[in-house]
Design a protein with these regions (language model features):
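Basic, Lys/Arg-enriched alpha-helical interface segments
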Residues: 1-95, 116-166
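Active-site beta-strand-loop-beta-strand hairpin of nuclease catalytic cores
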Residues: 103-113
Length: 166
């Protein structure tokens, strides 16, 4: 079995991971579907999902793409040529889940926001989730820059040792 090419990271804020909370709040069939799709599709394809029915780039939100889950976990696994565990529950209802993501670094996907589009199909809800994903990405980028700024020496001199950097 091959190793996933992409690492999935949950955006964290105030000690919580909103997409993980979303995942855990779903009913069992949808939770299994999203977990199977994240680990067997997104972790292998990363931004490549945007070249398929699994994803698309979000207009007006640079760097953010939408990961789309439309099948139950058993279907996801079968489509990937993987065995389906007997304990996996197959769903007969509609599955229409969305997770908004950002790719960065060396093949890392940051999971920013998610919602059940089947439950709330309105454009208003979709727009609100995209806005939330954009805000989280902005905060995440700012947090990534802070440590880098703190680590840079001022005027080429390390404050700790008082020596010039090479």
């Amino acid at each position: 079995m091959r190793t996933p090419e992409w690492k999935l990271e949950f955006y964290e804020e105030k000690g919580r991971a909103p997409v993980l909370d979303f995942l855990r709040g779903l009913d069992q069939i949808k939770e299994q579907a999203l977990a199977a799709a994240l680990s067997n599709v997104l972790a292998y394809e990363g931004i490549g999902v945007c070249r398929s029915s699994w994803g698309k780039w979000v207009q007006g939100a640079p760097g953010i793409f939408e990961f789309r889950v439309r099948h139950d976990a058993a279907t996801v696994l079968r489509e990937r040529g993987l065995p389906v565990p007997k304990e996996l529950r197959e769903g007969s209802g509609e599955i229409l889940l969305r997770v908004f993501c950002h790719a960065h670094g060396k093949k890392v996907v940051l999971l920013l926001a998610g919602y059940d589009k089947g439950k709330e199909p309105s454009m208003k809800r979709q727009s609100a989730e995209i806005k939330r994903a954009k805000q989280r990405l902005t905060r995440w980028k700012a947090a990534q820059e802070r440590p880098a700024k703190q680590a840079r020496p001022i005027g080429g001199v390390h404050k700790r040792r008082g020596k010039r950097r090479p």
